[in-house]
Amino acid sequence: MEAIKKKMQAMKLEKDNAVDRAETAEQQSREAALRAEKAEEEVRSLQKKIQQIENELDQVQEQLSQANSKLEEKDKALQAAEAEVAAHNRRIQLLEEDLERSEERLKIATQKLEEASQAADESERMRKMLEHRSITDEERMDGLEGQLKEARTMAEDADRKYDEVARKLAMVEADLERAEERAETGETKIVELEEELRVVGNNLKSLEVSEEKALQKEETYEMQIRQMTNRLQEAEARAEFAERSVQKLQKEVDRLEDELVQEKEKYKAISDELDQTFSELTGY
């Protein structure tokens, strides 16, 4: 009987120890479950951050693509402006060459006019000299009359030549007026072209400034992309670490649950043994 009591006390003590171990295992299991939930929550938070970073990265890449498109458009506009400037330069060169030819024709016409005027003055001088000379000798008179006729003929020829020269001079003056009008038109066009060149130059400067800003923005975007990539890599590393931690905690939870099941089985076995012992004692 004393042995049975000792055995019952030992079994009760073992039962109490098993209950304590079971409670401890349950507490550890709950704590492990809380740690696992916390780790899972951190993983979800990291996944959200990763998704947010990926969205920001997509936005930055889209902005970079738009900036590159705008930069290409500005390059095309710059090339078109340069082509327009080259066309204006060619037009100015043609106008300058036309003006030089007109000035050369005017110079030649002026020289011819001076030569014709000198010839007409010389003929008129000879005619007046022959008309006013007093000659008493008949032969000399006849000779002089012949010379006079010849001089008149020469004068008439000179008049005809003068008329021809005058007609040509009028044509030259008309050509000169047209050349001057063309020169004035050319000067006006040159002024307009210079103004256009100034506007184009300002546009080129603006494009250069815009290009510099675009390059600066591109560098900023690239730096942001590098930063986002680093942040994404760090977040992925943290996520991998958190996943490994969750796996470890899950293994710990599984182990504690297995121990809990074992302790419950031991507790059940002890309870069954106690019940059997009580039944035996009662029957005894």
From Swiss-Prot:
Q: Where is this region: Disordered?
A: 1-38
InterPro entries named in the record:
Tropomyosin
Q: Where is the composition biased (Basic and acidic residues)?
A: 12-38
Q: What intrachain disulfides are recorded?
A: none
- Reading the lineage from the top rank, the first entry is Eukaryota
Which keywords, in A-to-Z order, does the entry hold?
Coiled coil, Repeat
Question: Coiled-coil regions in this chain?
Answer: 1-284
Subunit organization: Homodimer.
Q: Which family does it belong to?
A: Belongs to the tropomyosin family.
Domain notes from UniProt: The molecule is in a coiled coil structure that is formed by 2 polypeptide chains. The sequence exhibits a prominent seven-residues periodicity.
Role summary: Tropomyosin, in association with the troponin complex, plays a central role in the calcium dependent regulation of muscle contraction.
**Full protein name:** Tropomyosin
